[in-house]
Amino acid sequence: MFKNNLRFTSWINQHKFYQLDLSLKTRSIKQIVLTLVFKTLVLGFFGLIVIFPFYLMVVVSFASDERALDTRTPILWPDSWNFDNFSRVLSDGKYLNAIVVNTLVTVLSVLLTLFFTICMGYSFSLRKWKYKKLVWFFFLSVLILPESALLIGQYRIVIVANWNNPNSPLIVLGLIMPFVSSVFSGFMYRTSFEAIPSQLKESALIDGCNGFNYFLKIALPMVKSTSWTVGILTAFSAWNSYLWPLLLLGNRVDLNINLWVLQQGILDANSSDEQIRTLLNLKMSAAILAILPMFIIYFLFHKRIMNAIKNRANTIKG
């Protein structure tokens, strides 16, 4: 009798555990399916928000002038593929010159930013020097100010240095003024240099390596990922700048690609009462030509760009 009761109790327990395990499996499958559906919907929604403007830009760039002027009907698909729109915006002959100047400004901004921020970050990573904390606090206080608040001081410097003449080669120095240094980039380099073990520097000094050789041959290669991050972010910032070139160049659209895009597709009014009309198909064609170099750079260095964004996010969190 006791054995039968024991067997019956064991069977009941096994049956309960089987039902419990089955319910957990069923619940986990439901959670996985619901989570997958939720992630798909959320990612699809935000992906649509990001991709749709690019899709609209490409579609409108091939539209005819009649459809571009008709603001009542949205252009979701072109009635014809008008590649002539691209040749029309290139006919003014200013695109190539704007691309060359923009590239020169971007390259110089990246090189000078790397030089100044590396020196800044390394100097603040050193352990002791007089008034280090006070000077660092002063630099960090600049981060509180918005970039637009610094334009007045930067513009004043450019005026005093006579770098604001669009007909002079010195205008390039004026255009790179806001991008040659960055406190945030210096902060990134300081964090990276401080992460290098102090024992490594001590071993290098014992082996006869002086301070400059340690910085050049050991410390600098170890912050290569930070250099890629700073370089990529500076390049995008300098290439996409609009307010500062507008302030310096005015109507010289041949010296900045964004100003060139802004002037495309504008129709002169036939009378004083008529509003100025804009051909969006030409403006979108110009926008595609303007972002084409950055798209090429992105596809060549997309892995490093994503790592740069990730490193910047980790720096902000840290």
From Swiss-Prot:
GO terms for cellular component: plasma membrane
Topology of the protein relative to the lipid bilayer: Multi-pass membrane protein
PROSITE patterns xrefs: ABC_TM1 (PS50928)
Superkingdom of source: Bacteria
Covalent S-S links between cysteines: none
Domain ABC transmembrane type-1 intervals: 99-301
Keywords for this protein: Cell membrane, Membrane, Transmembrane, Transmembrane helix, Transport
GO biological process: transmembrane transport
Disruption phenotype: Probably essential, it was not disrupted in a global transposon mutagenesis study.
Transmembrane annotation, as ranges: 42-62, 98-118, 134-154, 169-189, 230-250, 282-302
Compartment annotation: Cell membrane
Function: Probably part of a binding-protein-dependent transport system. Probably responsible for the translocation of the substrate across the membrane.
Family to which this protein belongs: Belongs to the binding-protein-dependent transport system permease family. MalFG subfamily.
Protein name: Probable ABC transporter permease protein MG189
Species of the source: Mycoplasma genitalium (strain ATCC 33530 / DSM 19775 / NCTC 10195 / G37)
